[in-house]
């Protein structure tokens, strides 16, 4: 798939089968960093093989961490507590799950580092995290536009003068980065570390993932709801010995959606009713749209209408603040709804791999949908009968755009996905797995 300029999707009629999900991107990169910061050795299984995890692995090796060879999703990391390499230039691609947490960890350890990424990474805000780290005395310099990467880290005087405040309304990754790095500073300073959230915290389930994983590495965080988080002065990460990565719940959304519009059943394995990922809640969105959803330990299954034969999903008006990534799948499913659909509270889309509100608006209109959008909302009216249009779908160098619009193959229009290789960020084999579930239209 890598290197292909485009992929013409075969017109699809039915979907059924089972998919073993790749490892969660959010969990994979968190666990890699936690294992590096922990005492002892951690054997990680089920690790996602993707651009973002390869970026994190390369950075850890560059920082002096002993990282074993990755084989079949397994890798062993020897924890170092403090990175041996105190001067480095790190290229972190477009991986926010690597850039933000590494920025915090490096800033609180001391040293001299330069962090950069692809041009889009330099358009994704990091100012709120930098402002919070500067409250600890961290020396951080913007090497381009203020508030954005690239960054130079070093030259500060780290201290703890009281609670540190961080804005929560732009990205939950800023709070995640501070939480994960806080035990490093607590140990160094001998003081409790308190982080206070300013504004409305978005994407709360991702913070739950962070707290859950920190606990598995031996650090429990005291919290006052979503307003304040305290890490004790004696907090120390300790490797759990062995750590299995859950399947990616955001990726599960595309396959569960296939079951909802292609009859099904489609079952995903690797996530289930006991998942720590908030995006499993997308299954409830599908149920509200009329799909039959079933859960078990380590699996979720959907059955639904056959939109290629005239079936329709129920329209929705929903707040997607808690599951912004999976919400993109809902936006594409709106093509098959029985009325206009509205997605609210999705302002975080603006600062993802691309401006996803603008990108989704543009590409849905190409297919004939009526689309309106604002700062943090999107409304999609499905194409009128006879109103579908053949389209070349731009993916905007965004893996989720490519995967979402694979669902458009169930409509009557011819669909071409441009730059399908962008799925390598999280799921290089996506289109092969997708094709294995489909029955084509005659």
UniProtKB/Swiss-Prot annotation:
<protein>
    <recommendedName>
        <fullName>3-phosphoshikimate 1-carboxyvinyltransferase</fullName>
        <ecNumber>2.5.1.19</ecNumber>
    </recommendedName>
</protein>
<feature type="binding site">
    <location>
        <position position="203"/>
    </location>
    <ligand>
        <name>3-phosphoshikimate</name>
    </ligand>
</feature>
<dbReference type="GO" id="GO:0008652">
    <property type="term" value="P:amino acid biosynthetic process"/>
</dbReference>
<comment type="similarity">
    <text>Belongs to the EPSP synthase family.</text>
</comment>
<dbReference type="GO" id="GO:0009073">
    <property type="term" value="P:aromatic amino acid family biosynthetic process"/>
</dbReference>
<feature type="binding site">
    <location>
        <position position="425"/>
    </location>
    <ligand>
        <name>phosphoenolpyruvate</name>
    </ligand>
</feature>
<feature type="binding site">
    <location>
        <position position="325"/>
    </location>
    <ligand>
        <name>3-phosphoshikimate</name>
    </ligand>
</feature>
<dbReference type="InterPro" id="IPR036968">
    <property type="entry name" value="Enolpyruvate_Tfrase_sf"/>
</dbReference>
<dbReference type="GO" id="GO:0003866">
    <property type="term" value="F:3-phosphoshikimate 1-carboxyvinyltransferase activity"/>
</dbReference>
<feature type="binding site">
    <location>
        <position position="25"/>
    </location>
    <ligand>
        <name>3-phosphoshikimate</name>
    </ligand>
</feature>
<feature type="binding site">
    <location>
        <position position="26"/>
    </location>
    <ligand>
        <name>3-phosphoshikimate</name>
    </ligand>
</feature>
<feature type="active site" description="Proton acceptor">
    <location>
        <position position="325"/>
    </location>
</feature>
<dbReference type="GO" id="GO:0005737">
    <property type="term" value="C:cytoplasm"/>
</dbReference>
<dbReference type="InterPro" id="IPR001986">
    <property type="entry name" value="Enolpyruvate_Tfrase_dom"/>
</dbReference>
<dbReference type="InterPro" id="IPR006264">
    <property type="entry name" value="EPSP_synthase"/>
</dbReference>
<keyword id="KW-0808">Transferase</keyword>
<dbReference type="GO" id="GO:0009423">
    <property type="term" value="P:chorismate biosynthetic process"/>
</dbReference>
<keyword id="KW-0963">Cytoplasm</keyword>
<feature type="binding site">
    <location>
        <position position="30"/>
    </location>
    <ligand>
        <name>3-phosphoshikimate</name>
    </ligand>
</feature>
<feature type="binding site">
    <location>
        <position position="96"/>
    </location>
    <ligand>
        <name>phosphoenolpyruvate</name>
    </ligand>
</feature>
<feature type="binding site">
    <location>
        <position position="173"/>
    </location>
    <ligand>
        <name>phosphoenolpyruvate</name>
    </ligand>
</feature>
<feature type="binding site">
    <location>
        <position position="173"/>
    </location>
    <ligand>
        <name>3-phosphoshikimate</name>
    </ligand>
</feature>
<comment type="function">
    <text>Catalyzes the transfer of the enolpyruvyl moiety of phosphoenolpyruvate (PEP) to the 5-hydroxyl of shikimate-3-phosphate (S3P) to produce enolpyruvyl shikimate-3-phosphate and inorganic phosphate.</text>
</comment>
<comment type="pathway">
    <text>Metabolic intermediate biosynthesis; chorismate biosynthesis; chorismate from D-erythrose 4-phosphate and phosphoenolpyruvate: step 6/7.</text>
</comment>
<feature type="binding site">
    <location>
        <position position="352"/>
    </location>
    <ligand>
        <name>3-phosphoshikimate</name>
    </ligand>
</feature>
<dbReference type="InterPro" id="IPR023193">
    <property type="entry name" value="EPSP_synthase_CS"/>
</dbReference>
<comment type="subunit">
    <text>Monomer.</text>
</comment>
<feature type="binding site">
    <location>
        <position position="400"/>
    </location>
    <ligand>
        <name>phosphoenolpyruvate</name>
    </ligand>
</feature>
<feature type="binding site">
    <location>
        <position position="171"/>
    </location>
    <ligand>
        <name>3-phosphoshikimate</name>
    </ligand>
</feature>
<feature type="binding site">
    <location>
        <position position="25"/>
    </location>
    <ligand>
        <name>phosphoenolpyruvate</name>
    </ligand>
</feature>
<dbReference type="Pfam" id="PF00275">
    <property type="entry name" value="EPSP_synthase"/>
</dbReference>
<feature type="binding site">
    <location>
        <position position="124"/>
    </location>
    <ligand>
        <name>phosphoenolpyruvate</name>
    </ligand>
</feature>
<keyword id="KW-0028">Amino-acid biosynthesis</keyword>
<dbReference type="InterPro" id="IPR013792">
    <property type="entry name" value="RNA3'P_cycl/enolpyr_Trfase_a/b"/>
</dbReference>
<keyword id="KW-0057">Aromatic amino acid biosynthesis</keyword>
<feature type="binding site">
    <location>
        <position position="356"/>
    </location>
    <ligand>
        <name>phosphoenolpyruvate</name>
    </ligand>
</feature>
<feature type="binding site">
    <location>
        <position position="172"/>
    </location>
    <ligand>
        <name>3-phosphoshikimate</name>
    </ligand>
</feature>
């Amino acid at each position: 798939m890598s290197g292909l300029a485009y992929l013409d999707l075969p017109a699809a009629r039915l979907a059924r089968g089972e998919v073993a999900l790749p490892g969660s991107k959010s969990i994979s990169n968190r666990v890699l960093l936690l294992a590096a910061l922990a005492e002892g050795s951690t054997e990680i299984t089920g690790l996602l093989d993707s651009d973002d995890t390869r970026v994190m692995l390369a950075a850890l090796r560059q920082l002096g961490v002993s990282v074993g060879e990755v084989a079949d999703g397994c890798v062993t990391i020897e924890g170092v507590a403090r990175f041996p390499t105190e001067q480095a230039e790190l290229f972190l691609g477009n991986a926010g799950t690597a850039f933000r947490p590494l920025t915090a960890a490096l800033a609180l350890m001391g040293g001299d580092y330069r962090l950069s990424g692809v041009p889009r990474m330099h358009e994704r805000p990091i100012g709120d995290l930098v402002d919070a780290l500067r409250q600890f005395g961290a020396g951080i310099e913007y090497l381009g536009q203020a508030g954005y990467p690239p960054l130079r880290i070093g030259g500060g005087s780290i201290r703890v003068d009281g609670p540190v405040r961080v804005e929560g309304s732009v990205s939950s990754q800023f709070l995640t980065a501070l939480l994960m790095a806080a035990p490093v500073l607590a140990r160094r300073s001998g003081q409790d570390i308190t982080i206070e959230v300013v504004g409305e915290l978005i994407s709360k389930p991702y913070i739950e993932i962070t707290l859950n994983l920190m606990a598995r590495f031996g650090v429990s965080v005291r919290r006052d709801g979503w307003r304040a988080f305290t890490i004790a002065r004696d907090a120390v990460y300790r490797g759990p010995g062995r750590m299995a990565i859950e399947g990616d719940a955001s990726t599960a959304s595309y396959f569960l959606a296939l079951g909802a519009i292609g009859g099904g059943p489609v079952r995903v394995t690797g996530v289930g009713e006991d998942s720590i990922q908030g995006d499993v809640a997308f299954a409830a969105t599908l149920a509200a749209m009329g799909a039959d959803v079933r859960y078990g330990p380590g699996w979720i299954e959907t059955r639904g209408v056959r939109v290629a034969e005239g079936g329709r999903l129920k329209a929705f008006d929903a707040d997607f603040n808690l599951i912004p990534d999976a919400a993109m799948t809902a936006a594409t499913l709106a093509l098959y709804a029985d009325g206009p659909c509205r997605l609210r509270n999705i302002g975080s889309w603006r600062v993802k791999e691309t401006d996803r509100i603008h990108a989704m608006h543009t590409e849905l209109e190409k297919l004939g949908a009526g689309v309106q959008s604002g700062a943090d909302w999107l409304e999609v009216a499905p194409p009128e009968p006879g109103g579908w249009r053949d389209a070349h779908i731009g993916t905007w160098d965004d893996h989720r755009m490519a995967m979402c619009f694979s669902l458009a193959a169930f409509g009557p229009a011819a669909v071409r996905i441009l730059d399908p290789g962008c799925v390598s960020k999280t799921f290089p084999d996506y289109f092969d797995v997708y094709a294995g579930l489909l029955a084509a239209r005659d």
